[in-house]
Amino acid sequence: MGQILGKIMMSHQPQPQEERSPQRSTSGYPLQEVVDDEVLGPSAPGVDPSPPRRSLGWKRKRECLDESDDEPEKELAPEPEETWVAETLCGLKMKAKRRRVSLVLPEYYEAFNRLLEDPVIKRLLAWDKDLRVSDKYLLAMVIAYFSRAGLPSWQYQRIHFFLALYLANDMEEDDEAPKQNIFYFLYEETRSHIPLLSELWFQLCRYMNPRARKNCSQIALFRKYRFHFFCSMRCRAWVSLEELEEIQAYDPEHWVWARDRAHLS
């Protein structure tokens, strides 16, 4: 009887935690592990015993912080208006780089210089002391027209020089009388025999004498040639001042560029 009471007393005494065998749950895992994973008691008031978890939310917070760090850089970036200015500057640099990539090839300068040796053209330039029909800008337009017409350089002849010069005067000059002299120099009329008569006078004199009829036919033929030359340039007769200066800059020491009306006394 005493032995039985002793065993009962021993069974009610608390055993140390180390000697307790973990009880199995219905799932087959220790109850202690399940409790430890699910319930964690606070070790001290106001202290969170759980370690910080780097979850997806933490990554997003970090990305937000990184983006917030980049925001000052975005504020320092140039505004769209400044970007447009930069693009405009790049455009100007491209122009400077291209130098408008002048379509006037060296062969057209060579054709122009070759025609300057023509005796009739020399006589016209020597006669035009006041530079009323052949100043430096009008002569530069001749080179531009040669380029736009697109003929091979060796095909340009005296008639093309006079057609281009006449068309340049049509574009830039308002006085018709000096321009008529270009036509008469083309047909090798001397200055003393140049009748500064209007087209109406030629029409009235058409049937009066053979010379008048010849002049009328020459004027009609010249105008026909001028129209074809104008069409060969695709009707682009206007030349900008910038392009004229670029043409002169190709050979700035050329003697024809000294024919400046501003230098006349």
UniProtKB/Swiss-Prot annotation:
UniProt biased composition (Acidic residues) = 66-80
Pfam entry (one): Spy1
For region Disordered, the annotated ranges are: 1-80
Task: Offer an example of a GO molecular function term for this protein.
Answer: protein kinase binding
PANTHER family reported for this sequence: WBSCR19-LIKE PROTEIN
The record's comment on protein family reads:
Belongs to the Speedy/Ringo family.
Q: Give the protein name, as stated in the record.
A: Speedy protein E13
